[in-house]
Amino acid sequence: MERNHWNEKSSGAKRSRERDLTLSTIRSILAADERLRIKASSYLGVGRGVDDEAVIDIFPTGQTMSFLRLLHGFLGTCRGQSMHQVLRDPCVLRKQLLYGVCKTLFDTITVRRVAEEWKLHAALFPYRALDEEDLEQYLLVWSASLRQSVQTGVLGALRDILYQYADNDDYGLYVDWCVTVGLVPLLDVKTKPSEAAERAQFVRAAVQRATETHPLAQDLLQANLALLLQVAERLGAVRIANAPEVRVFKKVRSERLEAQLRGKHIRLYVAAEPLAYERDKLLFTTPVAHLHEEILRYDGLCRHQKICQLLNTFPVKVVTASRHELNCKKLVEMMEQHDRGSDAKKSIMKFLLNVSDSKSRIGIEDSVESFLQDLTPSLVDQNRLLPARGPGGPGVVGPGGAVVGGPAGHVGLLPPPPGPAAPERDIRDLFKKQVIKCLEEQIQSQVDEIQDLRTLNQTWENRVRELRDLLTRYASRREDSMSLGARDAELYHLPVLEAVRKARDAAPFRPLAVEDNRLVANSFFSQFVPGTESLERFLTQLWENEYFRTFRLRRLVTHQGAEEAIVYSNYTVERVTLPYLCHILALGTLDPVPEAYLQLSFGEIVAAAYDDSKFCRYVELICSREKARRRQMSREAAGGVPERGTASSGGPGTLERSAPRRLITADEERRGPERVGRFRNGGPDDPRRAGGPYGFH
């Protein structure tokens, strides 16, 4: 009942309008948020999850891609790497499926069905003798023929089905993901109705073809047709993702591992979860992750060996190194040049400046005198050159032409002057010679300086060229590392001439003159190729130890100790094959195959599954029952039946009344005993005792 307010409007109507307005507002907010989310996700790309959560990429990355490359021989191939091929053998899965299906088929048989088969055989080929050896041979022939018929029919049908639907590399891809990343991306394949009908038709046709002449095998397979269809359907319903668009990542906040294929989420099976102890980085615990660093080191040595083999083919190779140009000899030469007293350029420039500043004859004479004294002070006789300006003032000519004068009483013998113009000519000639000498020295010094600068320029040019080559080489190495070594791997597959050309481009050798500023560091007069045998043996041991200890593979050896084969063990089946069978194919009801059966052929595996099944036990039961019944009938036929009323040894007048027994007529003896009754004291023989493969000896 609604209450009316003074404005004649009910409170319920008011609340209804407010509720509608609130709901409308909420819807508008949600719609706007959805549009914003869609627009934001279109800009974020695949690097984010649906909820914009930060992720750590696991695959593909440079590290995980190198895992796959080195696993299949593209990096660091050695003898021990073949251990992986043993583990990824697809025949293991086919033999596991064959054994599991056969064991299930043979265990579904009933003892009544085996007894009916025996009755049919006994009615067609009745046994008429009472000899135990003949009876045992008769039963042996029946059991062996029944066994062969069933095994042939089952083997033919299952072989066609397995090679049709299990003849792919999914198991190998599963093993590759397990030993490299530890995570297996799974792609569920949607089956169309037409494909399901075609698969069912193929299975029925395979059963019909294989069991046309084996009725019991046909009945057995027809009764278990649902199991065969399930195996074929599961083999085609799941695929291991094998495409460049596969992406595996881990969400940081929720710590969930997810996989995507072309932007769509797919299933992910976790075989070995990576460790997340470092921020924004995962540590892998797989066998290949443990071997990764050693494989890269070995691969680098192999590439170095290949480059040396391609390049070190010339008769002589010289490696030079730069040495410092300021050695001892150079230092001494520079010191001597610096300590030299006279400088021709400075002297002639000083002379020209003095002459230009002179205003009189006396100033010019002083300039000439200073110039000559600076150049050749010991070769010029100042008294003869300028008698009036000698160092001792005006001299006194003594007898015989001796001139006495000077501060220390210098006495010199001078020849008589040839004439008034002789001193002037001597000064001119000497001045001209000195000027020419100064110019020659100046020119020579300029030439020497030019030569030194040229040598220094050549040295720096060589240095710049070396630095440029180093930069080019480092840039090429960076490009090679970004391209994951694809170009380096081509050296092993290219023709010789093409490989030599690429190697020379990568590490060019050029002729170089050994100058004064370079010295010879090393030289090669023959081909040098480093050895990799020791490192290869070490890496092989690492491969074997890692796989043997992780998966517990079994090594088969001959009597001489030589290795014959490396096979799966029971632990390997439980570690590798059963997870694929249970978690991926969803066929966990199949029994695991024993390790001893993995070395057998398909026919031998079917025979082994027959021996381990109830089918074989029921056949043994029927044979034991027939032998016991025949023994009982033989004892009854061998013993006589006394007449009634015959006196016995118990005493006079006493009669022994025996149980009434029917005598066997000649016709019954000719036709053989009736197939009635059960055995009393018989027991099944051991089918595994020595003497034959099937028992009944």
From Swiss-Prot:
Biased composition regions of type Basic and acidic residues, renumbered to the chain: 664-689
Highest taxon, organism lineage: Viruses
Keyword DNA-binding among record annotations: no
Protein name: Portal protein
UniProt record similarity statement: Belongs to the herpesviridae portal protein family.
Segments of this protein annotated with the region Disordered: 633-697
One GO-annotated biological process of the protein: chromosome organization
Keywords: Coiled coil, Host nucleus, Viral genome packaging, Viral release from host cell, Virion
Gene that specifies this protein: UL104
Keyword set includes Translocase: no
Cellular component GO terms, alphabetical: host cell nucleus; viral capsid
Subunit comment: Homododecamerizes. Interacts with terminase subunits TRM1 and TRM3.
InterPro entries: Herpes_Portal
Localization: Virion; Host nucleus
Source organism of the structure: Human cytomegalovirus (strain Merlin)
